[in-house]
């Protein structure tokens, strides 16, 4: 052990930060870049898959070519969602990174592999989130859009998604927080994110407890700050509490950005005022 390494716990913490602060900084940068970009790409993937999975089938022409193609596409997308939601990201990372190299001779760099793995994993979860958000909006909204001549995609973009997004936003934030923490599994393919950088720092002086104490605090700070920023955005999206969010799922009313208790209290007060003649 290096003679310059202090013997007390806090002294070692200071020593590690002074000598390896840049390593932690680079690890933080890589972790946040992977989490932010991959969450965004995953949301885009989930958005389009969610829309496709909610395309209604023509029951009168059950075996038409269009219906058969739609069934095949939905089957493939559902398989993708179930497989990537039902397997650990670490296993997916190993399978994709080494599988592409072995089967297709595709050798990806650190960034490409990290973005691909986390994005498709997030996309599987967000697909179900978007599908649930779409279903939560009252079906009368869809029927009304069809009456005025909108197709399914126009209905989703202009009518359903603006309403569903307020319900979906908390889950998007949750996935970002999860990706910040779970990016550490990418160390198995050599991605030098925060966890991987910490292993290098800890191994230099065998200060595993001290190094990972620092990393634990860093992860907490990152997720705490992100959660507060996301909560601020959610509150901004709440907007005016003088209108009702159109949903058919009462559970949605009690979750996420929708302030159910405040809304119910406001409605009760207005009804009481009406009865009182105000």
Tell where the protein language model's regions lie, with residue ranges.
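Transmembrane alpha-helices and adjacent helix-loop boundaries
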Residues: 1-278
């Amino acid at each position: 052990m290096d003679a310059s390494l202090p013997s007390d716990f806090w002294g070692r913490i200071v020593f590690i930060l002074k000598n390896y602060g840049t390593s932690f900084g680079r690890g933080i940068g890589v972790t946040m870049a992977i989490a932010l970009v991959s969450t965004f790409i995953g949301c885009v993937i989930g958005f389009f898959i969610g829309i496709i999975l909610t395309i209604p089938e023509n029951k009168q022409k059950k075996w038409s070519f269009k219906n058969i193609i739609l069934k095949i596409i939905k089957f493939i997308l559902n398989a993708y969602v179930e497989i990537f939601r039902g397997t650990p990201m670490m296993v997916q990372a190993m399978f994709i990174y080494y599988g592409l190299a072995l089967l297709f001779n595709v050798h990806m760099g650190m960034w490409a592999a990290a973005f691909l793995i986390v994005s498709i994993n997030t996309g599987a979860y967000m697909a179900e989130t978007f599908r649930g958000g779409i279903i939560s909006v009252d079906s009368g909204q869809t029927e009304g859009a069809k009456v005025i001549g909108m197709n399914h995609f126009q209905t989703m973009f202009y009518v359903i998604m603006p309403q569903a997004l307020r319900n979906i936003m908390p889950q998007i934030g949750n996935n970002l927080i999860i990706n910040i923490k779970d990016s550490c599994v990418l160390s198995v393919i050599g991605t030098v994110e925060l966890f991987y950088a910490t292993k290098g720092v800890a191994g230099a002086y065998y200060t595993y407890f001290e190094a990972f104490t620092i990393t634990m605090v860093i992860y907490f700070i990152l997720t705490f700050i992100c959660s507060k920023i996301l909560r601020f955005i959610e509150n901004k999206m709440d907007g005016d509490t003088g209108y009702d969010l159109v949903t058919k799922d009462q559970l949605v009313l009690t979750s996420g950005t929708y302030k159910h208790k405040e809304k119910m209290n406001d409605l009760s007060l207005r009804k009481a005022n009406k009865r009182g003649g105000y």
